[in-house]
Curated annotation (Swiss-Prot):
Keywords: ATP-binding, Carbohydrate metabolism, Kinase, Nucleotide-binding, Transferase. It is an enzyme of class 2 (transferase). PANTHER family: ANHYDRO-N-ACETYLMURAMIC ACID KINASE (PTHR30605:SF0). It comes from Parasynechococcus marenigrum (strain WH8102). Pathway: Amino-sugar metabolism; 1,6-anhydro-N-acetylmuramate degradation; Cell wall biogenesis; peptidoglycan recycling. Pfam families: AnmK. This is Anhydro-N-acetylmuramic acid kinase. HAMAP family: AnhMurNAc_kinase (MF_01270). Belongs to the anhydro-N-acetylmuramic acid kinase family.
Length: 379
């Protein structure tokens, strides 16, 4: 079956669209990535999404206009990846505006901006969307949804295999080995903390909006990392939580950056970016250290996807801090780093079509597994 996956993450840089073919057993399908297209958001649209994602209020009319603009851009990206309309089903994540994990006094909720009936009409094909809602209704975090899909797409290796996505947020998947005493362990996954979100915001601030990310890690490479401050930050509450846990720009956005820059006081801009880059790597390394200590899980390799894998300084920091671990881009095993998350939502749409569960209670904390998403057909 040909499916189209559409994904825009917390970085809000645009929409990734992939056309993929799936067949066979849902848990280990035969799959082929046929095309990938990235459609950047216009600057004004991206800026508005980032501001709202950090808590800025907007009138209802403005949110409606924004939903329409996001939906139309999803359709634009879809046409770029599938100009001949070969896909028979579309899986669309939408644009997260706010994610609220469950707490002791409030159920979890998550808002992905999308007018799904409009998208189905624009593309003249059924759309599966709202993938997080069912897991949240079952008491889960609603995130991350990628780990179960990672296990299906990548499969086990000779030892524990990690897949790290470095988008706005760093999220981690751990896939048990194909043999040995731990082969029956569950797939694990959680949101580690910020990946590119703070680095990107700092670059935009320092360049007066001229640079939206640290291209090739050039700014970080010119600076010096403050490891003392990083160790202090690692003691913050979120980084002490045990999985399941999830987060987003609502926690690691402009206000969080402002506080961290104040704590760094009068350091040079390059030093600040170097420290934020090292912080991203240190958050991941700390989680992996705890995993070894608490559960005797030792990764054999760490495959890195998302825009952050194109930052050589960040990759070098990961290699330095994750001692003894082979760190490499997911491209090296045939999984295109920038296409991975869109491919996941193509798979989730196919799973919905097959009636196959898409969440994993061990990862999200939901009371049970369930088929995810809501299907909308064109009129």
């Amino acid at each position: 079956m040909l499916c189209l996956g559409l994904m825009s993450g917390t970085s809000a840089d645009g929409v990734d669209a992939v056309l993929a073919r799936f067949q066979g057993a849902p848990d280990r399908p035969e799959w082929q990535l046929l095309s990938h297209h990235h459609s950047p958001y216009p600057a004004a649209l991206r800026d508005e999404l980032v501001r709202i994602g950090q808590g800025e209020a907007r009138p209802a009319a403005a949110l409606l206009d924004l939903a329409e603009a996001v939906t139309e851009h999803q359709a634009l990206a879809a046409r770029g990846a599938d100009p001949d309309q070969r896909a028979s089903l579309i899986g669309c994540h939408g644009q997260t505006l706010w994610h609220r994990p469950p707490s002791s006094d409030k159920r979890g909720a998550s808002w992905q901006l999308l007018l799904a009936p409009l998208l189905a009409q624009l593309l003249a094909r059924p759309v599966v969307h709202d993938f997080r809602a069912t897991d949240l209704a079952l008491g889960g975090q609603g995130a991350p949804l990628v780990p179960r899909a990672d296990a299906a797409l990548i499969g086990p290796g000779d030892g524990w295999r990690g897949v790290l996505n470095l988008g706005g947020i760093a999220n981690l998947t751990l896939i048990p080995p194909r043999w040995g005493p731990q082969k029956q362990e569950s797939v694990l996954g959680w949101d580690c903390g910020p990946a590119n979100s703070l680095i990107d915001l700092a670059m935009e601030q320092f360049s007066d909006g001229q640079q939206l990310f640290d291209r090739d890690g050039a700014m970080a490479a010119a600076g010096r990392c403050d490891d003392g401050m990083i160790q202090r930050w690692l003691r913050e509450p979120y980084f002490q939580l045990s999985p399941p846990k999830s987060t987003g720009r609502e926690c690691f956005g402009q206000e969080d950056l402002r506080r961290r820059l104040q704590e760094l006081e009068s350091v040079e801009r390059a030093d600040a970016v170097a420290t934020l880059t090292g912080f991203t790597a240190a958050v991941v390394a700390q989680d992996l250290d705890r995993l070894r200590a608490d559960r005797s899980i030792h990764l054999l390799e760490l495959l890195v996807a998302g825009g952050g894998c194109r930052n050589p300084v960040l990759m070098s920091e990961l290699q330095r801090r994750c001692r003894g671990l082979a760190v490499r881009a997911s491209d090296q095993i045939g999984l295109a780093a920038e296409a991975r998350e869109a491919l996941v939502f193509a798979l989730l749409a196919w799973w919905h079509h097959r009636g196959h569960p898409g969440n994993a209670p061990a990862i999200t904390g939901a009371t049970r597994e369930a088929c995810l998403g809501v299907r909308v057909a064109p009129a």
